[in-house]
Regions:
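Short edge beta-strands and adjacent beta->alpha junctions
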Residues: 1-67, 73-84, 89-92, 102-525
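Short, solvent-exposed loop/linker segments at beta-strand-coil boundaries, enriched for Pro/Gly
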Residues: 94-98
Length: 525
């Protein structure tokens, strides 16, 4: 039976979304109009004409603040002469309304969640029937979550060739800037981007950190490398106000950096994310999902995902792609069917190596994704599906200040047990959190193995009371390692719903240290 150990509970509120929007409309923006006087009142004329409106103090002050990816909290302060009985109607700009009663001077607070991301015009109306008066104030606002738009895999940066930056290596403890907004068909106003970042020609060990251009560099890392290694890793990173992303070389010698885009995020309705419990779609060793046998050198396999593992209207998929048993050095490239293989790469490997990388890739019109073997000799390929993007999905990306949630080298309980797992409460009890963008790194590895990441059906209370159920060991891999290696990989992990507990499984027969950093989450409300 696997032994589970608890990691410290995360607190998304303390990590904080990267931006909270506030909106304001003062009382001076209130527009008054007189109502028809009721028949039989002293104010009514024989012809039923409108009266001059009473309650000259009637007005509204509107303030709103984003509370979630889709949600806002509206505060309406009702200004009025004393003694009035007031009715307030809230039109949210999406075809829905609410209404309340209010007293003069009262501040009414309401929360609202929009089904789709975007810009809305909220209209609030306060009516004083007794004085035949009505006031309207309007408040334009927008949601803060970001939806995903797939982008044909494209190389935006290659310091070896001068693509996207001056030709030449990135010097020690320096950054390369990658233009995102306005580059090619990428629009202005992009909030975040999915990039496959690769380091190569490294003379010494180090790490790479991706962060918004012009922003403060976090203490977390996105990929780690050793001398002579070529290492890729997927990053989902906010775009700076200048429209760029910075890639920092944390080595004491120069390196070459490569960045390939596969999609971007904006605050307009597009495709939301739905995480899944990882499922294996392809394993060429056994013939699952593809012909049995290695993918030939310079060969391609098509993987049917749309209509099988993900809905037929999925626009992109989140995968973990693994090369194993390669006969020579090379790379794998994932791309949508119906297109030519691009000059990008997703997984880089050495002969005999087993190596995985997270991939976000657009889906072809036929629901397929192609995987190209860029080596001149064969390799086996494994593809695990961990999620998808679609117009029907409501999971909007919310970046957080990057934070380290776990480092077993420093937490006092030692490394991960052989064949054991660590359970981590990230958003237990919170409604609407669908999944998380995490970076996992193993280090101080003693034996070959792999890491699996999966949602947990047990609650923290069950673990603390000793009543947890035994879990089925997952088989899908997030990253693979050999003895002595430090290996990172991004994972878009499912929350398992309101439970919000994620498990990290050591699939090795020896100990390993684990580091987990968080970069954001997907929210459905």
């Amino acid at each position: 039976m696997a032994k589970g150990v608890s990691a410290p509970a995360a607190d998304l509120a303390k990590l904080g979304a990267s931006e909270v929007k506030k909106f304001h409309s003062p009382a001076e923006h209130s527009v008054r109009k007189a109502l028809p006087a009721a028949k039989g009142t002293a104010a009514a004329t024989a012809q039923g004409a409108e009266t001059a409106a009473g309650n000259p103090d009637l007005g509204l002050v509107l303030d709103a603040q984003s509370t979630s990816a889709h949600g806002i909290e509206l505060k309406a302060q009702v200004l009025s002469s004393p003694g009035a009985n007031l009715r307030v109607v809230y039109s949210w700009g999406d075809g829905t309304t609410d209404s309340t009663q209010a007293l003069p001077g009262q501040e009414v607070s309401l929360k609202h969640s929009y089904a789709e991301l975007g810009e809305y015009n909220v209209k609030v109306t306060v009516t004083d029937l007794a004085n035949s008066a009505e006031v309207v104030n309007e408040l334009p606002l927008s949601t803060v979550g970001s939806d995903f738009t797939p982008y044909a895999p494209t190389r935006l940066l290659d310091t070896r060739t001068g693509t996207g930056a001056p030709k030449g290596m990135v010097q020690a403890y320096s950054s390369a800037k990658v233009k995102i907004a306005g580059n090619g068909k990428i629009p202005a106003g992009v909030t975040a981007v999915a990039l496959n970042v690769t380091v190569t020609n490294a003379a010494n060990p180090g790490h790479v950190t991706a962060f918004p251009g012009g922003g403060t560099r976090p203490t977390t890392s996105n990929l780690n490398f050793e001398a002579g290694q070529t290492v890729p890793n997927l990053v989902v990173v906010p775009v700076g106000k200048d429209g760029t992303v910075e890639l920092y070389n944390g080595s004491w010698t120069a390196v070459d950096l490569i960045a390939d885009i596969t999609g971007y995020f904006t605050r307009t309705a597009a495709s939301g994310y739905t995480p899944m419990a990882p499922v294996r779609a392809v394993d060429t060793r056994s013939g699952q999902g593809a012909p049995q046998g290695q993918v030939a050198g310079r060969g391609t396999i098509g993987v049917q995902l749309g209509g099988w593992y993900v809905p037929s209207n999925a626009t992109a998929v989140a995968l973990n792609v693994t090369a194993t048993g390669p006969r020579e050095d090379g790379h794998l490239t994932a791309y949508p069917s119906g297109q030519q293989a691009p000059n990008t790469s997703n997984v880089n490997f050495k002969a005999g190596q087993t190596v995985a990388n997270s991939v976000v890739v657009p889906v072809g019109a036929d629901g397929k994704v192609n995987v190209f073997n860029g080596a001149w000799a064969g390799t086996d390929v494994i593809v695990d599906v961990v999620g998808y993007y679609s117009p029907d999905s409501s999971g909007a990306f919310m970046p957080v200040t990057p934070g380290r949630m776990l480092d077993t080298r420093a937490w006092g309980q030692g490394p991960m047990y052989p064949r054991g797992y660590i359970w981590m409460p990230i958003s237990h009890g919170e409604q609407g959190i669908a999944g998380y963008v995490l970076n996992t790194t193993v280090t101080n590895t003693k034996d070959a193995g792999f890491l699996s990441v999966a949602p947990d059906t047990n609650t923290p209370d069950q673990y603390e009371s000793g009543t947890e159920s035994q879990l089925t060991r997952p088989t899908a891999s997030t990253l693979n390692w050999t003895a002595g290696k430090t290996v990172p990989n991004l994972v878009q992990a499912s929350s398992g719903g309101v439970n919000g507990v994620v498990d990290f499984w050591n699939q090795s027969w020896n100990t390993t240290d684990l580091i987990v950093d968080i970069f954001g989450y997907y929210e459905t409300k």
